């Protein structure tokens, strides 16, 4: 378990950011995604983009080509991305909400993402 995930509590919304981009950015692998989804039962996953990537296998057919993504969505955990400006947050714990557009027959939507510090 990466040290920066030791603060995750059961039922949290997990937002991740990193100052790195490209090949240097950290990758959320399937094992970590399954731990977050199945052991910690997180409510939502929000990777900062650029900065966080997830494991992909472009040679595999769908749905096996993105095991990290599938670990989340297969456990009914929404993924909110790309989150921008989360690197400006200064607290480890924030109140977070994601307000999607109400669009019929869509499985995804843009959101208004709001993080409030110093509430928890």
Predicted regions and their residues:
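Active-/binding-site microenvironments in catalytic and ligand-binding cores
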Residues: 1-120
